């Protein structure tokens, strides 16, 4: 027995040393630039990448942040929060834009708050006002909560039941009150409204709050455990991909009990990514994709309703998320970089706030590691792509992250195959060389893809487009990252592109 356990100790010592030397061999073997892929829609939900994940949500078209417009069928006029909010709500507009658009906050599958353009909520104002509807409260409570009652034949015919049990009615075009007891669905009924959905969000907030506290935890954990597995790292490493960029949300730092509706357990999933990366000799870039307050208003920033509110007041909390991630993963030889904030959007995120945050986030990483690179994402929107260069040059082991899509702008709308490829070889090549200075930070094309606005392109067209991008983005000194690994839309999926011979890296 004794000698047997002695042997076990000796044996485990040898296995241990072997593992250690292997991990040193791997880390010393590691060279830039990286060929990476984004594990998008894994730990930060993006509904468009796999819409079926939302299928089990009741009233799944009425999620947080859904933008709705309401037209009185009797008056044929839209509801409007006068001045965008802060005063009365009327029903006198013949067309609808920002003041006539309300963002839903979902309480449960049938109860909602309505947030107006200036961020107030509309609700009943009863003091001497006869339950008049006003958009004056900056918080949502009992008086701001309404049940959306949908017509069973036409779900876009609705009546809004207030917390006094009565319905909102458009008595006249300037008088909207919550005092109607009728129940007809006639056009002439003053409580019937046509609901038009003009915008949707499908991010982490929407899926977790949509399923609700009873169902969301199991659904999210099943997703984390099945969407990305050991096999995926095996597939990637054997196909020439040597790193993964893993988008995470701020709530991971509150694991295992993040504030509702977010669900605990995502840090366990990220731990697994490190285990698999280690096993297959790959590197991990942790990417804070969703900051509290939302740095860009997109669903992939974890936003509840699409308002972009990240700024100075959120910096301490955001730095503590970086601190959590750096503390937890700094010792892993697979950690190659931490990206402090994905796609901050100008002008809502100012350059001053961003540099202030980047400086503090950088220091948080350096508390735990001198080796990991710190990645600074350039701002999207109207911003100079070189605005971070001198700042980043003053710090060691930093990287500027740029995202290149021939999409999301009218200028790409009518480009044909060759024009798209020329754009890569000319404009993208020079944009990239502008951020690749000799003594400054490294450069990373952290997101790109082979999707474009060309209709009916052939496989060969896609292959040429992919090859052009690999050639040009291959000049980025830190590397590139395909968006994404898995996606319901094939050309956005590096897995599909490799399996079908559209992209070859080895
Ligand atoms: C080091 O890199 C070489 C060439 O890319 C590769 O063949 C080898 O397997 C790598 N070794 C380790 C330990 O990863
Ligand atoms: C709608 O009603 C409000 C309140 O009476 C008024 O100030 C506004 O001018 C009206 N707008 C239109 C387009 O009639
Ligand atoms: C939904 O929320 C409302 C308002 O808080 C509550 O009265 C109602 O019971 C809830 N319904 C369900 C099904 O939880």
Model-derived features with residue positions:
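N-terminal secretory signal peptides that target proteins for export/translocation
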Residues: 1-6
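Cleavable N-terminal signal peptides of Sec/SRP-targeted secreted and luminal proteins
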Residues: 8-25
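Extracellular low-complexity, O-glycosylation-prone Ser/Thr/Pro/Gly-rich "stalks"
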Residues: 27-28, 51-63, 189-193, 494-506
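Active-site region of glycoside hydrolase catalytic domains
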Residues: 31, 198, 294-454, 470-471, ...
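Active-site mouth of glycoside hydrolases
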Residues: 32-36, 41-66, 199-372, 383-384
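Short, solvent-exposed loop/turn elements at domain surfaces
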Residues: 43-50, 78, 408-411
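Lectin-like carbohydrate-binding module/patch detector with strong preference for beta-trefoil
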Residues: 60-199
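Aromatic-rich peripheral "rim/lid" segments of glycoside hydrolase catalytic domains that contact
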Residues: 458-506
């Amino acid at each position: 027995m004794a000698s047997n356990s002695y042997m076990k100790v000796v044996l485990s010592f040898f296995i241990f040393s072997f593992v250690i030397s292997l991990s040193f061999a791997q880390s010393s073997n590691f060279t830039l630039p990286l060929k990476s892929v984004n594990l998008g829609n894994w730990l930060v939900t993006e509904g468009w990448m796999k819409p079926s994940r939302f299928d089990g949500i009741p009233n799944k078209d009425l999620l947080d942040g859904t933008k709705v417009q309401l037209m009185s069928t009797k008056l044929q006029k839209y509801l409007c929060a006068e001045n965008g909010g802060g005063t009365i709500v009327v029903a006198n507009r013949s067309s609808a834009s920002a003041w006539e658009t309300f963002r839903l906050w979902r309480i449960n599958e049938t109860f909602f708050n309505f947030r107006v353009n200036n961020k107030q909520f509309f609700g009943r104002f009863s003091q001497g006002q006869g339950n008049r509807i006003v958009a004056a409260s900056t918080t949502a409570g009992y008086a701001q909560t309404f049940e959306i009652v949908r017509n069973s034949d036409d779900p876009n015919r609705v009546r809004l039941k207030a917390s006094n049990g009565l319905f909102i009615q458009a008595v006249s075009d300037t008088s909207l009150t919550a005092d109607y007891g009728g129940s007809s669905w006639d056009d002439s009924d003053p409580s019937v409204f046509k609901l038009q959905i003009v915008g949707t969000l499908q991010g982490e907030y929407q899926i977790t709050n949509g399923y609700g506290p009873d169902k969301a935890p199991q659904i999210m954990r099943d997703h984390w455990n099945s969407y990305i597995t050991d096999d995926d790292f095996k597939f990637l490493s054997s196909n020439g991909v040597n790193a993964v960029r893993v988008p995470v949300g701020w709530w991971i730092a509150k694991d295992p009990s993040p504030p509702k509706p977010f669900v605990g357990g995502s840090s366990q999933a990220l731990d697994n990514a490190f285990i698999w990366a280690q096993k297959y000799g790959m590197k991990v870039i942790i990417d804070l994709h969703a900051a509290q307050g939302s740095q860009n208003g997109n669903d992939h920033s974890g936003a509840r309703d699409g308002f972009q509110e990240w700024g100075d007041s959120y910096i301490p909390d955001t730095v503590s998320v970086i601190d959590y991630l750096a503390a937890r993963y700094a010792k892993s030889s697979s950690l190659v970089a931490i990206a402090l904030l994905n796609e901050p959007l100008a002008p809502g995120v100012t350059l001053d706030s961003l540099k202030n945050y980047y400086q503090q986030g950088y220091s948080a990483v350096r508390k735990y590691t001198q080796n990991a690179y710190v990645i600074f994402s350039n701002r999207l929107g109207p911003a100079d792509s070189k605005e971070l260069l001198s700042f980043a040059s003053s710090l060691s082991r930093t990287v500027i992250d740029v995202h290149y899509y021939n999409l999301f702008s009218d200028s790409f709308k009518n480009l044909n195959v060759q024009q798209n490829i020329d754009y890569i070889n000319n404009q993208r090549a020079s944009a990239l060389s502008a951020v690749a200075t000799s003594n400054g930070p490294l450069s990373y094309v952290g997101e790109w893809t082979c999707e474009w606005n060309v209709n009916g392109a052939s496989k060969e067209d896609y292959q040429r487009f992919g090859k052009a991008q690999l050639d040009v983005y291959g000049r980025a000194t830190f590397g590139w990252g395909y968006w994404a690994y898995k996606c319901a839309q094939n050309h956005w999926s590096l897995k599909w592109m490799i399996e079908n011979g559209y992209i070859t890296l080895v």
